[in-house]
Amino acid sequence: MKGQEETLLGKSVGQLTDWVKQQGQPAYRGKQLHQWLYQKGVRSLTEISVFPKAWREELKDYPIGRSNIVHCTIAPDQTRKYLLSLGDGLIIETVGIPTSKRLTVCVSSQVGCPMNCDFCATGKGGYTRNLTCAEIVDQVLTVQEDFQRRVSHVVFMGMGEPLLNLKEVIKAVKILNQDVGIGQRSLTISTVGVPKKILELAHHQLQVTFAVSLHAANQTLREQLIPSAKSYPLPKLLADCRKYVEITGRRVTFEYILLGGVNDLPEQGIQLAKCLTGFQSHVNLIPYNPIEEADYQRPDGESINRFKSILEEHKIAVSVRYSRGLEANAACGQLRAMSAAKN
């Protein structure tokens, strides 16, 4: 990417083999380098003990592409929110979400976000640039290193709109799958919807989970919540989602943040059900996490259950996802650079 320093992280085993050969080393060093980068997670080439000492010394300042943790907050449920400093000093956020059987990483795809969703803390902080493939992969390796256990799942639900950085996101998906060793079906790409990009993603024929942040079943309300929806009318968005299912053979997950008194009314549940009838899909209802910058409220339990029941009555597959890491300001929609607020 323009202006970004080339790093070893983000390269495939073939590319790494080409690189070591350019350095005058035998081809087998490429596989060694690949293993130490992606399986051992080294932060400096001097750590690669199988390399000749003299060569390691030559490479001591060569950029791998690893970030530094500048802050980590741990919630009572052991969710960890990280502020990571990139090579150019910009700060991004990453979240590690552990359970007894899983370790999920919520990765950022951009520094900030240009979509400016009305209820989201990240969008209030503006947008700076796209992340590189290496900067995305690094987030997973950093969380894996900090937890001292393998990452099992990755969700592209952190800072940024993944489909606005699709080239680097696709590269990161392939590296995470083929090089880090995470199954594609354990990777989730989420979007609020970007014209033409859903079908572009579909034609890559990935086996990832695809999630669309819907949040409203009528265009007027959706534009209020998601300003970018003005350029992507709901009927066209849903039509593209249906084409995605046809092309990939995989269902679409619809994320629906429940905002008390705004989009959680019974008639809105019926409206959503009608939009999705006959659709190969699943709905994730997410009770809102209040932020200082937006005047929305979390719905009560009765409203949540009522909305879920309406969808179930219409034979819509639905579940309620309660966000982890609330105490760490790390839950869905609350990702923002705390350092920016201090400056």
Swiss-Prot record:
This is Probable dual-specificity RNA methyltransferase RlmN. It catalyses: adenosine(2503) in 23S rRNA + 2 reduced [2Fe-2S]-[ferredoxin] + 2 S-adenosyl-L-methionine = 2-methyladenosine(2503) in 23S rRNA + 5'-deoxyadenosine + L-methionine + 2 oxidized [2Fe-2S]-[ferredoxin] + S-adenosyl-L-homocysteine; adenosine(37) in tRNA + 2 reduced [2Fe-2S]-[ferredoxin] + 2 S-adenosyl-L-methionine = 2-methyladenosine(37) in tRNA + 5'-deoxyadenosine + L-methionine + 2 oxidized [2Fe-2S]-[ferredoxin] + S-adenosyl-L-homocysteine. GO terms for molecular function: 4 iron, 4 sulfur cluster binding; metal ion binding; rRNA (adenine(2503)-C2-)-methyltransferase activity; rRNA binding; tRNA (adenine(37)-C2)-methyltransferase activity; tRNA binding. S-adenosyl-L-methionine binds at residues 160-161, 190, 213-215, 289. Residues 99-327 form the Radical SAM core domain. GO terms for biological process: rRNA base methylation; tRNA methylation. Its EC number is 2.1.1.192. It comes from Crocosphaera subtropica (strain ATCC 51142 / BH68). Its cofactor is [4Fe-4S] cluster. Binds 1 [4Fe-4S] cluster. The cluster is coordinated with 3 cysteines and an exchangeable S-adenosyl-L-methionine. It is an enzyme of class 2 (transferase). Belongs to the radical SAM superfamily. RlmN family. Keywords: 4Fe-4S, Cytoplasm, Disulfide bond, Iron, Iron-sulfur, Metal-binding, Methyltransferase, rRNA processing, S-adenosyl-L-methionine, Transferase, tRNA processing. [4Fe-4S] cluster binds at residues 113, 117, 120. The active site is at residues 93, 332. The keyword Kinase does not apply. GO terms for cellular component: cytoplasm. NCBIfam families: rRNA_mod_RlmN. Specifically methylates position 2 of adenine 2503 in 23S rRNA and position 2 of adenine 37 in tRNAs. InterPro entries: Aldolase_TIM, Methyltransferase_A, RlmN_N, RNA_MTrfase_RlmN, rRNA_lsu_MTrfase_RlmN/Cfr, rSAM. Reaction proceeds by a ping-pong mechanism involving intermediate methylation of a conserved cysteine residue. It is found in: Cytoplasm. Disulfide bonds join 106-332. It comes from the Bacteria.
